[in-house]
């Protein structure tokens, strides 16, 4: 029996959250084409044979001067030292530059490269990319081609990860899908629904805070505040006669209901907090895993 923690590291939009969902065969990590959709570290528990792997989905690594993005990157870098194995996720279409930047952080724990999205390319392109990574072979333990859309890739990746975990009793109940709080997951589902319903920069000026939860045997009641930075953005979130907010609520309610396995009553409110993305105290509270 082995058990351990694996930090998933990589550039924004490398497919980290989609990879976690494919390993779980459940939707639990926020997925969006928008940069840095993942704002908090999600811990997802995958049982593989008799072994327990706890994946930590971190914010994407990238360069930015914005306060929020700096804190996201700090969170990702910190997780490098708080795990047993690092899984570096890279798209087969990306250059090795991001991996070289990762190596410059001097990771002290073993790492594996998951070369993602291989279902979207041909063998010649895959082999070329593998040869590009080969010059770094003294640094990584293995490089594994992966596709989140095909279950056949799952076992090979998990087998490789388990090799580098220590013998240890389970850290969590094997029946759990995630060590992250349900409140945190519900919050991310609402945020994802904002991403899906509003384009361009508006979602980046928005955040979600859960104000109240009440869980009964047949009904989950949630009240949440969508925080945004201007009155004009508030108007866009609400939409004409509340249509946009209703659509966001409907989409989020469906996702939460699927996870909670019960009917959900979701009440959404929109609040303006100017310059919240530059308020370090507010952001640190927001990004705190225990919040």
UniProtKB/Swiss-Prot annotation:
Q: Which GO terms describe its cellular component?
A: cytosol; plasma membrane
Which residues participate in GTP binding?
Answer: 10-17, 57-61, 116-119
Q: Where in the cell is it found?
A: Cytoplasm; Cell inner membrane
Quote one Gene Ontology molecular function term. small ribosomal subunit rRNA binding
Q: Where is the Era-type G domain?
A: 2-167
Q: What InterPro entries would the database entry show?
A: G_ERA_dom, GTP-bd, GTPase_Era-like, KH_dom-like_a/b, KH_dom_type_2, KH_sf_prok-type, P-loop_NTPase, Small_GTP-bd
Q: How does it sit in the membrane?
A: Peripheral membrane protein
* Family per similarity comment: Belongs to the TRAFAC class TrmE-Era-EngA-EngB-Septin-like GTPase superfamily. Era GTPase family.
Question: Entry's HAMAP family?
Answer: GTPase_Era
Known partners and oligomeric status = Monomer.
Q: What is this protein called?
A: GTPase Era
Q: Which gene encodes it?
A: era
């Amino acid at each position: 029996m082995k058990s351990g923690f694996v930090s998933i590291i990589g550039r924004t939009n490398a497919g980290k959250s989609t990879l976690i969902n494919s390993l779980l065969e459940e939707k639990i990590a926020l997925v969006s084409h928008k940069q840095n959709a993942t704002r908090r570290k999600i811990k997802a528990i995958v049982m593989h044979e008799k072994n327990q792997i706890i994946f930590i989905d971190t914010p994407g690594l990238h360069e930015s001067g914005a306060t929020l993005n700096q804190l996201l990157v700090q969170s990702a870098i910190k997780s490098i030292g708080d795990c047993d194995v690092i899984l570096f996720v890279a798209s087969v279409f990306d250059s090795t530059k991001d991996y070289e930047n990762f190596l410059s952080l001097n990771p002290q724990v073993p790492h594996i490269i998951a070369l993602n999205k291989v279902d979207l390319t041909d063998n010649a392109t895959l082999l070329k990319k593998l040869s590009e990574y080969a010059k770094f072979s003294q640094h990584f333990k293995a490089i594994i081609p992966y596709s989140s859309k095909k279950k056949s890739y799952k076992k090979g990746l998990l087998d490789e990860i388990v090799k580098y975990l220590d013998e240890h009793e389970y850290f969590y109940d094997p029946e759990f899908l995630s060590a992250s709080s349900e409140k945190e997951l519900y919050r991310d589902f609402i945020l994802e629904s904002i991403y899906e319903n509003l384009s361009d920069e508006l979602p980046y000026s928005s955040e979600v805070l859960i104000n109240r939860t009440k869980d009964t045997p047949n009904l989950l009641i949630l009240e949440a505040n969508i925080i945004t930075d201007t009155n004009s953005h508030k108007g866009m979130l609400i939409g004409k006669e509340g249509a946009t907010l209703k659509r966001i609520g409907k989409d989020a309610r469906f996702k939460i209901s699927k996870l909670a396995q019960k009917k959900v009553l979701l009440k959404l409110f929109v609040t303006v907090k100017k310059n919240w993305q530059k308020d370090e105290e507010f952001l640190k509270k927001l990004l705190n895993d225990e919040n």
